[in-house]
Amino acid sequence: LLIDILTRLRTEQDSYYLLFNELLHARVLYEKSMYQECFQVLKKVKEKAVYYENHFALLVAQRLELNYLLTLDFEDMDEQKLLNKQYKMNNTLKSIRQLNEQSSLYELLKYRMINRGASRSLEETQKLDDLVTSEISIVASAGVENFEIKKNHQLFQANYFITVGDYKAAFNSFVELNKLFEENSHLWNNP
C-alpha cells in the first residue's frame, strides 16, 4: 500500500513515472482487447515522451505499437505508414545510442579526473584529447535539438576545463548549463 501511494505521488512529479505508468495502462488495455483505447494511450505517451525528451519511454511506446499492430495483422495500415513508424523508431534508437556514447565519454572523463586528478602537464592534457574529440563529434552529429545532448556537452566541457585548469572556461560552461536548464524547465523532475 505504501509503495502504491509513493508511486502515485511520483507519477505527478516525475515524467518517467508518468510515462511508464501510462505504458502499463496501454498494455492492460491491449490485453483486454481494447485496441482503440490502447493505441490512443500509446499515441499520447509518444507525444508526451517527445515533449519531455524521454527517448526510452518513446522507444517502448513505439515498439509496443508495432508489436500490437503486427499481432493484429496491420489492420487498416498501408506499407508507407508502417515504414514511417519504423523510421521514427530507428531515429529514437539513434538518439539513445548517441546519448549513451556521450554519457560513456563523460563517465570516462570523470573516472580519469577522480583517479588521476588535474592535468599537470601538456602530456596529461593530450591524453584527454581523444575524449574531447569524440564528444564533440557526437554533439556535431546529433543534428536535432536535444536537451540531454546539450546538458551532457556542457557538463563534459566544464569538467574537462576543470581538469586542465581552465577555470574561466569551466565557469562559462556552467553558466551555459544553467541557461539551458532555465530555458527547459518543463524537463525538470520535481523530487
Model-derived features: where do they sit?
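Intrinsically disordered, low-complexity protein-interaction/activation regions
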Residues: 1-32, 70
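Start-of-helix signal in alpha-solenoid helical-repeat scaffolds, especially tetratricopeptide repeats
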Residues: 12-20, 57-59, 66, 99-103, ...
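Tandem amphipathic alpha-helical repeat scaffolds
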Residues: 22-31, 63-72, 104-123, 151-166, ...
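Amphipathic alpha-helical segments of tetratricopeptide repeats
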Residues: 43-51, 84-94, 130-142, 171-187
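Alpha-helical repeat/alpha-solenoid scaffolds of the HEAT/ARM/MIF4G superfamily
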Residues: 75-130
